[in-house]
Amino acid sequence: MYTDLKDKVVVVTGGSKGLGRAMAVRFGQEQSKVVVNYRSNEEEALEVKKEIEEAGGQAIIVRGDVTKEEDVVNLVETAVKEFGSLDVMINNAGVENPVPSHELSLENWNQVIDTNLTGAFLGSREAIKYFVENDIKGNVINMSSVHEMIPWPLFVHYAASKGGMKLMTETLALEYAPKGIRVNNIGPGAIDTPINAEKFADPEQRADVESMIPMGYIGKPEEIASVAAFLASSQASYVTGITLFADGGMTKYPSFQAGRG
C-alpha cells in the first residue's frame, strides 16, 4: 500500500470492467477518491463504486464516451467539482477486434483509433491542462499494450493505436517534465479480463498463449492494478516517459516477437 495515495483524486476511464475495474478498486483500497467512468453499463459502474467504498475509498460514477471531446471535458470538470481537485488520470478505455487488414473498414479503423488513441489524448490533454493551470505535479497513466512494440496480425488498427500511444506518451512526458507532471504507459501482456474471456475459455487457445509467456501463466487484472498504483505513487517520483511492461516476460519471448499472438 502507498500511504501518499490516500485522498488523491483518481479518474479511471473504462472503469466499470476488466483492468479499469481492478485499478479503480485498487485505488479504493489505497483510500483514494475515485471517479469511475463508464460508457453504457451503469449497473456495473455502481458495483465498482460499492467495492471502492467498501474498501475504504470514496467514489462517484460518470457516464461518458471517451471519443467525444465534450464527454472527456465533463469527466475532468466533474472530478474537480465533486472532489475538489485532480491528481491522477488513467486513460484505460479501449476496444479491439480481429479483422484481416484487407477487409478492415474505415469505420472499424476509426472506432479503434478514436477510442484507444484519441480518447487517451483527450484525457491526457484535459488532465494536463488542469495540472498546468493549478500548478499541480499530476500524473497521467495511459493503458498501452505489448503491441505498442510488437506487430499483431489481424489487429492492425489496435497495434497502430498502441504504437501511436507510445510516442504520444513519450512526447507529453518530455514536454511537461519541467513542470513536474509525469506521463507513463502500462503495457500489459495477456491478462484474464472479459475482453479475453472467450479466447481463454478454450483450453487449447489458453495453453497456446501460456506457452508464449516465460512466467507460464496469464496475468491477473490485480497485477496490472498494482503497477498503476506504483506509477501513481511517490515511489515512482523519478519515473516518466516509459512503458512499464507487465507481461510475464512475453515481449522477450522469441516466438512472440516473430509474430505469434
UniProtKB/Swiss-Prot annotation:
Further comment found in the protein's record:
Prefers NADP to NAD.
User: Which sequence ranges form a coiled-coil region, renumbered to this chain?
Assistant: none
Keywords on this record?
Answer: NADP, Oxidoreductase
Which NCBIfam families has this protein been placed in?
Answer: PRK07231.1, PRK08936.1, PRK12826.1-2
Report the protein name in the record.
Glucose 1-dehydrogenase 2
Q: Which residues bind substrate?
A: 145
Asked whether the keyword Transcription is assigned, the reply is no
Q: Which residues form the active site?
A: 158 (proton acceptor)
Under the heading PANTHER family, the entry gives: OXIDOREDUCTASE, SHORT-CHAIN DEHYDROGENASE/REDUCTASE FAMILY (AFU_ORTHOLOGUE AFUA_5G02870) (PTHR43639), SHORT-CHAIN DEHYDROGENASE_REDUCTASE FAMILY PROTEIN (PTHR43639:SF1)
Reaction equations catalysed: D-glucose + NAD(+) = D-glucono-1,5-lactone + NADH + H(+); D-glucose + NADP(+) = D-glucono-1,5-lactone + NADPH + H(+)
Q: What class of enzyme is it?
A: oxidoreductase
Entries under PROSITE patterns matching the protein: ADH_SHORT
| UniProt xrefs under InterPro entries | NAD(P)-bd_dom_sf (IPR036291), Sc_DH/Rdtase_CS (IPR020904), SDR_fam (IPR002347)
Q: Which residues bind NADP(+)?
A: 11-35
How is the quaternary structure described?
A: Homotetramer.
The entry sums up its family as follows: Belongs to the short-chain dehydrogenases/reductases (SDR) family.
Q: What is the originating organism of this protein?
A: Priestia megaterium
**Keyword check for Oxidoreductase:** yes
Q: Per its record, what are the GO molecular function terms?
A: glucose 1-dehydrogenase (NAD+) activity; glucose 1-dehydrogenase (NADP+) activity
Entry EC number(s): 1.1.1.47
